[in-house]
Amino acid sequence: MFYKIKGTHDLLPTQTTSWQKVENSFHSFFKKHQFQEIRTPIMEYAEVFHRAAQHSEMVSKETYAFPDKKNRLITLRPEGTAGIVRSYIENKLDQTNKLQKFYYYGPYFRYERPQFGRYRQFHQLGVEVLGKTTPFLDIEVITLIYQFLKSLGLDDITIQINSLGSKEDHLDYVDIFKQYLKIYSNYLCGLCHERLNKNPLRIWDCKTCHLQDFLKQAPKIFDSLSPKSKKRFQTVLNGLEAMKVNFKTCHDLVRGLDYYTHTVFEITFNKMVLGGGGCYDHLVAALGGNQLSGIGFALGMERLMLTLQENNNFFVSPQPSLKLFLFILDPVFFHHGLTLVHILRNEGFCVEFNYSFTTFTKGLKEALKCLPNYLLILGHQEFAKKQITIKNIKTHTQTTIDQKDLIFYFQQQRV
């Protein structure tokens, strides 16, 4: 008789039904919000991951890597972002001048010690948005993952959030942190001695050193951020508060991959970390593409299923109907506009909106690229009067209604 490999697990029919419900809910939820599915190979050339995160312990110590018959080093993917960025560049999507919103699902592989909710072959649900990052896009992505998990019945979700600032902020802090740690080098564990020169931020994740007073009193990366980076982060926090996302700032949070910049976050339920993500300003260029930014997150499916099973919660999201685009003309109205977006989405409508602010003509062109049935315009006059202007793209007719009548108006258009 043969046995499964250590760190893997079988999903029997009694389990796959529950998994399918969550998978279908994930597909439905992010399709409704204008994300498109992407599927990349489970194997990549090892250089893809080394270029993406050369100092990461996941890449240097936990990957399944082997030479093929032509002696090229192949790696079973340990995470989703690098392979998706490789595909984004190889297929010239970085040259389209269009924001690309992907979602993905599949198996991943890491050679680490198996424990509760953690396997050597595991599954992730994830999202990557490539082409730009703005604080408003950070708000959107974090709000969506928060609302997706709440749609599954997980009401006690907390987003642990921090900012790593720009690349320049990051480098300044690393110098300060390394100088500080040299004083206490005798107190570092063996692994953290290695980290000190390769990836010192990972010392914050050490379960041994983290308990010691010298690390508790160490300078935090947030203190090294430029005023511009701090302002960006505060914009994100203000937006999450406006969207009633339960979050907690955590200046010890650094994440395990060294390509992150600015916003980083982890998704927790009680004490269980379900996943995490963040922004990356230089990853696309590092893999040979244009200088473009992105933001993404991944959820561990195994951990999510354990959490759902403990709470007996499963929910399948409804399919979207009409396709709407809310054109917010001024960032002053952003929080109000985003609230309207989610009111409509919660009624099953497919709604997109602008993440950045430019001239009316350019903004209108970007809106029409999404091929909406209706264009909703929120300008100064509409905001002041609590109204919204609605343009039917097909008939070219236009009307202005009170915002409180939005749901009723579009329910009538469904008939």
UniProtKB/Swiss-Prot annotation:
SUPFAM superfamilies the record matches: Class II aaRS ABD-related (SSF52954), Class II aaRS and biotin synthetases (SSF55681)
Enzyme Commission identifier(s): 6.1.1.21
Gene Ontology MF term list: ATP binding; histidine-tRNA ligase activity
An annotated GO cellular component: cytoplasm
Catalytic reaction(s) noted: tRNA(His) + L-histidine + ATP = L-histidyl-tRNA(His) + AMP + diphosphate + H(+)
GO biological process, any: histidyl-tRNA aminoacylation
InterPro entries xref list: aa-tRNA-synth_II (IPR006195), aa-tRNA-synth_II/BPL/LPL (IPR045864), Anticodon-bd (IPR004154), Anticodon-bd_dom_sf (IPR036621), His-tRNA-ligase (IPR015807), HisRS-like_core (IPR041715), HisRS/HisZ (IPR004516)
Subcellular location: Cytoplasm
UniProt keyword terms in alphabetical order: Aminoacyl-tRNA synthetase, ATP-binding, Cytoplasm, Ligase, Nucleotide-binding, Protein biosynthesis
Gene3D superfamilies xrefs: Anticodon-binding domain, Bira Bifunctional Protein, Domain 2
Stored PANTHER family: HISTIDINE--TRNA LIGASE, MITOCHONDRIAL-RELATED, HISTIDYL-TRNA SYNTHETASE
Similarity remark: Belongs to the class-II aminoacyl-tRNA synthetase family.
Subunit text: Homodimer.
Name this polypeptide is given: Histidine--tRNA ligase
Taxonomic placement: Bacteria, Bacillati, Mycoplasmatota, Mollicutes, Acholeplasmatales
